[in-house]
């Protein structure tokens, strides 16, 4: 009897998904119509970015990549799915850490409340107090480059060290010591390993199952590894009587927590937000700086142009203030172009409202998972001329190379956009300005640029291999 029941269950599911499903009119691989597991079978190389580009070129701007999942690469999809007036809501992806909650939650009221508290740490006044501390880590990075004396360095690891050290300080007043000790912290290595499974884009029910099994097998996981690392530093921050003397991203979150009635306090929210600060604040900066240095080494003419733009903006001591460079056209163009080609969060899923959603005169049924691939959009000839080429001028002197600027949203848009954008841009501008004013950069001997790009992995954040560069001090 059980066999007949299962045969009927799976048989009817198969017929429904192949013939009667509301998404059947959208093109896509046949196996993807049958099961969401199709997607993870295609991502053994953790290359969702490449797959999304291939699928959009083969099937068009609306591609069914799961039984109830649609990938969109139409430029109007960004505003429709993520914009301020979008009726779309967060999907099951945001249940991954249940029952723990934080700013990355499906609960819109909780998210709105947490976002208001978070925003206090990212205002203009706060950024001005952070700048000297960011500058200190920039100069520590410059010291590491100078110590190499023109010998090859792995810029991907140095950018990672800079980003995590800076976020440890600004987020929690903590010293992670990665730049000082010239090594990757073991907790960061564990984070990278833990994020690798995200690159397979497993269905959420399977991800939850694996997490529950892992927690059952390793019950100490919450006190060891990256989670334990974050909790340890949060506990130290909470116990520090002098924490109010140095502004930090965590301070307004903790202040809000302590003002609540004891019965209303939820330490898990604070812990989740702590982890989110460290991860989100570090990955974007580290990856974007790595790719920016890659393209500048590949296209040295832009280094010359940047120096011509930046040298007149230096202070008497040869350093830069963010106020002087924040609107430097070519510097911002280099950053924007890097983010176009390698967006930090390429696939952010949403669920259409029950009444459905219209994108560019195309109706998408209700309660379907949709996302817009920033990676595929960034390389679409329908949106950018010479889309595969690194041309920063499209963001300043050559706006004709952008056919539809509304598709560009590396930090997302709307009320779920990245609050840390101003801080991330400040870090990137200062690193690039200070480094390029002191060093000539080039690929290390034997470095293969194509191999480097082919072995970049998309694990919801970028996992980047060794970027061998030489930095030679300018005479």
UniProtKB/Swiss-Prot annotation:
Its EC number is 1.-.-.-. Pathway: Mycotoxin biosynthesis. CDD domains: CYP67-like. It comes from the Eukaryota. It catalyses: betaenone A + NADPH + O2 + H(+) = stemphyloxin II + NADP(+) + H2O; betaenone C + NADPH + O2 + H(+) = stemphyloxin I + NADP(+) + H2O. It is a single-pass membrane protein. Keywords: Glycoprotein, Heme, Iron, Membrane, Metal-binding, Monooxygenase, Oxidoreductase, Signal, Transmembrane, Transmembrane helix. InterPro entries: Cyt_P450, Cyt_P450_CS, Cyt_P450_E_grp-I, Cyt_P450_sf, Cytochrome_P450_monoxygenase. Residues 1-17 form the signal peptide. PROSITE patterns: CYTOCHROME_P450. Heme binds at residue 418. One of its GO terms (cellular component) is membrane. Its cofactor is heme. One of its GO terms (molecular function) is oxidoreductase activity, acting on paired donors, with incorporation or reduction of molecular oxygen. It holds the Pfam family p450. It is found in: Membrane. It is an enzyme of class 1 (oxidoreductase). Glycans are attached at residue 336. The chain crosses the membrane at residues 276-296. Cytochrome P450 monooxygenase; part of the gene cluster that mediates the biosynthesis of the phytotoxin stemphyloxin II. The first step of the pathway is the synthesis of dehydroprobetaenone I by the polyketide synthase sthA and the enoyl reductase sthE via condensation of one acetyl-CoA starter unit with 7 malonyl-CoA units and 5 methylations. The C-terminal reductase (R) domain of sthA catalyzes the reductive release of the polyketide chain. Because sthA lacks a designated enoylreductase (ER) domain, the required activity is provided the enoyl reductase sthE. Belongs to the cytochrome P450 family. This is Cytochrome P450 monooxygenase sthD.
